[in-house]
Amino acid sequence: FAAKNIVEQVLGRMNKLQYFDVEFNPGGEKTLLTKYLPTFITHDFFKQKVFLVIDGDMQTDYIYDEDKLTVTQEKDTVYMKECVKKAYGVDIKAYVDGGKNGGRKDQELKIYREYLNYYQNSVFYLPNKSIPEKILLESQYAKEQYKDIIDLEKNITNENAKNILATISEADYGNTDHINDLIQKLAYKWSMEESSNKKMIEELINEIYKK
């Protein structure tokens, strides 16, 4: 939800919101990758038109270069499966036509290659290996408006950002039921400022837009 709001606010500032349909998966990144990615790579429309913007803490920095694969590696299902895990940070199953003798190896290899190509072309990450809640709390508005709460922590981190938001919600609304309202407000205020995070998200959006 927070990532969706950040991306939509930046799109709005760039006058590009009408070109995108931003959706978020409430199950989190791992569910998104393990459940939906196998479907994405089976449809040309999804492969060409669906892009993933994932929380920065999921970024693995894995570099996939198809040209550097040896013939042996290309035909090794265990190796290719491990490449997929190194890229995405999670195990993603290859769904193949089974039978008494199990799935077809060539089909499995093709799916792993599709996963890796999709990773290279269509998967993007929020900047600085940050989760969206951390990005929002690093805004000047948040630091000034909620200084007393934020200063209770030594630093804003991926580990404590959601708890800080919960504390702010309790201070503002008396409970944690309004975290989404708080996120929407913070995303709006954050988008009005200039920051390196915002600049990197603009670059990410432009890269997707050109595709």
Which residues make up each language-model segment?
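Conserved helicase/translocase motor-coupling segment
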Residues: 2-89, 94
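Generic hydrophobic secondary-structure signal
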Residues: 10, 53-54, 90, 97-102, ...
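Terminal low-complexity/disordered tails
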Residues: 150, 161-211
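Charged/polar, solvent-exposed surface patches and flexible loops
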Residues: 9, 35-39, 114-117, 134, ...
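Activity-critical C-terminal alpha-helical subdomain
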Residues: 55-173
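Generic structural motif recognizing short loop/turn segments at the entrances and edges of beta-strands
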Residues: 18-22, 119-122, 200
